[in-house]
Design a protein with these regions (language model features):
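Alpha/beta-hydrolase fold catalytic core
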Residues: 2-63, 88-89, 279, 286-289, ...
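Active-site loop/oxyanion-hole signature of alpha/beta-hydrolase fold enzymes
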Residues: 39, 48-49, 56, 96-133, ...
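Conserved HGGG/HGGXW glycine-rich cap/lid loop of the alpha/beta-hydrolase fold
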Residues: 51, 56-101
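Flexible "cap/lid" loop of the alpha/beta hydrolase fold
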Residues: 143-147, 156-187
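Conserved alpha/beta-hydrolase catalytic His-Asp/Glu region
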Residues: 186-247
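Short beta-strand/loop motif that positions the catalytic acidic residue
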Residues: 249, 255-257
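Acidic catalytic loop of the alpha/beta-hydrolase fold
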Residues: 260-272
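Catalytic active-site module of serine/aspartate enzymes centered on a nucleophile-bearing elbow/loop
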Residues: 284-317
Length: 317
C-alpha cells in the first residue's frame, strides 16, 4: 500500500507533464528537439546570467504582464490568454530556464534564482515594473519576486498558486523522494495523458498539444536536463515556503482558483477543500481579491480563459 501511495504521490506532483487525448497517434509521433516545438507566436531569446532565456513578447500597452508558467510547462500554457490580453497590455510569456526553448543545465533552480533571472530579463527588455502573473509553481515564483524584488512588481496575479499549502518535514522528504529525474524520464505515454486530465475539470481539446509536445521531446538531446529541472523545482517549492511571509507583500494581488482543482490541496497528503486553501492564502495577503471559478480545475487560465482574461482586465483597470 505504501508503495502504491508513493507512486501516486509522484504522479500528482507531475500534473503539468501532460496529455489529453486517446489517439493511437501518440505512439507514432516523431522525436522533436525543444526548439522545434511550434509556439504559434514568434519566440525571442536573450542571455541572462549566461543562460539563453526564451520568451514571447506581444502587445504594446503601457502596462506589462510577465507570465510565469508552472512545473513541467512552458510559455505555451498562456496561449489562451496572450491573444486577448495583448490587445491592451504588453505581454511577456517566458520559458523559465530548464523549460521550453530556454537553456537547460544543472543550474541553481531555486525560486529565488528564477525571480532574479526574471528581474534581469525585465531589465534587458527595458521594463521597470511589471504585473507578475504566475500559474501554480509560477505563482510561488511571483510571490518570491514580490518579496525579493518589490520595486519590480506592480501587482500580482496568482492562478492556482503553489505556496498556499503547508507541508511537514516528513511530507516534504516524501515528495522529494517521489520525484526524481529518473521518475520524470520514465513517465509513460499513458501516464502523461492521465496527468493532464487531472489538471482540468474537463480537459479542452485545445490542450491536446500538451501531450503531443511532451511525447515528442522525450527523445530530445536535452530531455535529461529537463527532467533534472522538474525534480529540482519540486525541492525548490518545498525549500522556499512563502505562507508565513504573505503579510509582507503589499502590492495588490488577484488570486484565482478553480473550484474543482484536484491538485490543491494535495489529495494524497491532506484532506480539505480547494476553497479553504485559497481563502487561507488570500486572507494572509494584505491587499488581495479572491475569485473562484466553478467547473474549473488547476489549469484555470487554459480551461476558463474568457473568465480569467476578463477578471485580469478588471483587476488591472
Amino acid at each position: 500500500m505504501r508503495k502504491l501511495t508513493f507512486i501516486l504521490m509522484g504522479v500528482v506532483i507531475l500534473m503539468t507533464l501532460q496529455g489529453c487525448s486517446s489517439s493511437r497517434g501518440w505512439y507514432n509521433l516523431p522525436v522533436a528537439e525543444f526548439d522545434m516545438i511550434d509556439y504559434q507566436y514568434p519566440v525571442q531569446t536573450t542571455q541572462v546570467r549566461n543562460i539563453k532565456v526564451a520568451y514571447i513578447d506581444e502587445g504594446q500597452g503601457d502596462q506589462v504582464i510577465l507570465m510565469i508558467h508552472g512545473l513541467g510547462s512552458n510559455a505555451k500554457g498562456w496561449l489562451q490568454n496572450i491573444p486577448e490580453l495583448s490587445k491592451q497590455y504588453r505581454v511577456i510569456a517566458v520559458d523559465l530556464p530548464g523549460y521550453g526553448k530556454s537553456d537547460k543545465g544543472h543550474y541553481e533552480y531555486t525560486l529565488s534564482f528564477y525571480a532574479q533571472v526574471l528581474t534581469e530579463l525585465l531589465g534587458k527588455l527595458h521594463v521597470d515594473k511589471a504585473v507578475w502573473m504566475g500559474h501554480s509553481m509560477g505563482g510561488q515564483i511571483a510571490m518570491v519576486g514580490a518579496l525579493n524584488h518589490p520595486d519590480m512588481v506592480d501587482k500580482l496575479v496568482l492562478i492556482s498558486p503553489a505556496g498556499f499549502e503547508e507541508f511537514t518535514d516528513g511530507e516534504g522528504d516524501w515528495m522529494r523522494k517521489a520525484v526524481s529525474p529518473e521518475f520524470v524520464k520514465d513517465t509513460t505515454i499513458r501516464g502523461i495523458a492521465v496527468n493532464l486530465k487531472s489538471n482540468f475539470h474537463r480537459a479542452p481539446v485545445e490542450a491536446d498539444f500538451m501531450i503531443t509536445d511532451r511525447i515528442q521531446v522525450r527523445g530530445a538531446r536535452d530531455f535529461d536536463n529537463y527532467c533534472y529541472a522538474v525534480a529540482e523545482n519540486v525541492e525548490a517549492m518545498l525549500d522556499e515556503p512563502v505562507l508565513e511571509r504573505l503579510g509582507e507583500i503589499k502590492q495588490p494581488v488577484l488570486v484565482i482558483f478553480g473550484e474543482t482543482d484536484r491538485l490543491i490541496p494535495n489529495r494524497f497528503l491532506h484532506g480539505g477543500y480547494t476553497a479553504d486553501i485559497a481563502r487561507q492564502g488570500a486572507d494572509l495577503l494584505p491587499n488581495a481579491r479572491l475569485v473562484t471559478l466553478p467547473e474549473c480545475g488547476h489549469f484555470a487560465q487554459f480551461e476558463k480563459p474568457e473568465a480569467v482574461n476578463a477578471t485580469v482586465k478588471d483587476f488591472l483597470k
